[in-house]
């Protein structure tokens, strides 16, 4: 039986009503899961991030990041960075980390987002091609680490196997799953998914480093002599995966965190790379007052390089949760399936920046390096991604 006092204390009494309609086996699973949860912490998250949520309007502690515009590099500087990058890649100083835990639902596609194809070429293949090109240029096959999630892990592995890893050596591709976090309804109560279990959703990309560590991959990188982790996500179809110039820029500056950015447009719903309290960080657009957001010159495009030594030192430090509200299918009080606004609590990888001591950013051209694929139609859509890939002769 569920602990009624605990349920009442933390606003979860509705679970008793669900329990009455469950089989013995279902009751056992529900009780086991609820007993695993820290209901006090979950309620505190609900209060802090939903009930008392605020946008950031005071920018007294926020300033522009230290950055270099790629367009302002001289030919000699660009060539120097490229050469340094090629040397570092050849010497095995970089690993590549891809965050690919999402589904293609918003594209009208059933399956891992990375397996979505544009004119017969999947997002995974677009990135694999670039890594294979680097192998030709440097003679070194980079270890490729790919973070999946419970919702797409098996399908992702199957997709790679069906496509012979796009010509990549399977021994150099390492898959691991991000962890989950419970979801809540807008009154702070746990919800049941369509299968009747406590709903959990991927805990955001901020769990990427702990998941790397848990799977032994941080230790592997260190033992392999890897000094930097190049990180990117599956959304950006124009990402330059570990381009030598950025690799060289990373090596020469030798910072804990090296980032790429673009000049944001006013009102653009993209996080801003800023310096807050003497630390570089990303402030999500949804967390900023709009007028404040428009004062900063660097939009985060999810491309960074991290020192392995820094990540190993900071990996177990606490990161804050952020709130996302999304319509998700769940069970109502009669066990019918409904779709309702649901609170998801997510960790963001960039919150690890607060533990770093050195930062630098390279601002690149949007037209060359940023085209997010988020929607089936309209802005940031299949149509815009296709157009951008064709414009740069990438498909």
Curated annotation (Swiss-Prot):
GO terms for molecular function: uridylyltransferase activity. CDD domains: UDPGlcNAc_PPase (cd04193). SUPFAM superfamilies: Nucleotide-diphospho-sugar transferases. The keyword Transferase applies. The keyword Transferase applies. Keywords: Nucleotidyltransferase, Transferase. Pfam families: UDPGP. It comes from the Bacteria. PANTHER family: LD24639P, UDP- GLUCOSE PYROPHOSPHORYLASE. This is Probable uridylyltransferase SH0870. It comes from Staphylococcus haemolyticus (strain JCSC1435).
